[in-house]
Amino acid sequence: MHRSQPLPPPELRDCPAPAKLNLFLHVTGRRADGYHTLQTVFQLVDWCDTLHFRRRDDGVVARVTDVPGVPAETDLVVRAARALQAATGATFGADIAIDKVLPMGGGIGGGSSDAATTLLALNHLWGLGLARAELMRIGLALGADVPVFVLGQNAFAQGIGEDLTPVELPESWFVVIHPKQHVPTAEIFSDECLTRDTPLSIIAVFAARTNKFDFGRNDLEPIATAKFGEVARALAWLKQHNQHARMTGSGACVFARFPDAATAQQVLERLPPEWDGRCVRSLARHPLAALA
């Protein structure tokens, strides 16, 4: 077993798994293996699932809370823990509880963020001492969005999402709307109408912009809004309050930036009752960044 540190106390509670927003998302190509190449900027925000971990000595990894619609054996949290065991030979296990608030199929990275928090927390609880880059490598095998949460910073991403360059973004407030539709990512990426040839952008061009929140577009947005009417309606409603509102990821959530918390809250108070909405604040760093 790989161990380079003395063991900490056996329990780590109240571990945040923050959501992300894609400030833009350009599909730049498709590889021979079927994966799409992208360019995007990931913005971390303070809307979080919360995970709790207890170390076990018997090697068993158990999710001890129910997550509707997600069997434990396929949950990215369980898969992340087992991937860490496989990569290191760790003989410890863990009981993992999840307070799940981030919507699934929302395009905000909830499952990927839960997996990253699991890697960060168990690397600490099991006394493994793996470097952040190694945890990112393990995370990439679980999903293309996992590495940015392990990186723990806002980032410009390229490739399939694994080529990450940290970027500094201004403090911001966003209104995020979940129109209560689940959008399957695979269905959006496989649509024959999806354009896959957006020209590559240069990170310096994005970084030099005074307003970083009207850059580019989300290439998946026309597909998702054509297929899912509630996504289209939520986006149209939000555009009445900010013309640069857009979808994050492959949907279903849509978002817009506002100058301050009070303005964002005023918009949220007008939200039609059939949708869920939230006022969120940007994060410069992942709350668990110090664990790696």
Curated annotation (Swiss-Prot):
Listed pathway(s): Isoprenoid biosynthesis; isopentenyl diphosphate biosynthesis via DXP pathway; isopentenyl diphosphate from 1-deoxy-D-xylulose 5-phosphate: step 3/6
GO biological process, one term: isopentenyl diphosphate biosynthetic process, methylerythritol 4-phosphate pathway
Matches recorded under Pfam families: GHMP_kinases_C, GHMP_kinases_N
Residues at the catalytic site: 20, 145
Binding site for ATP: 103-113
UniProt cross-references to NCBIfam families, sorted A to Z: ispE, PRK14608.1
The protein's name: 4-diphosphocytidyl-2-C-methyl-D-erythritol kinase
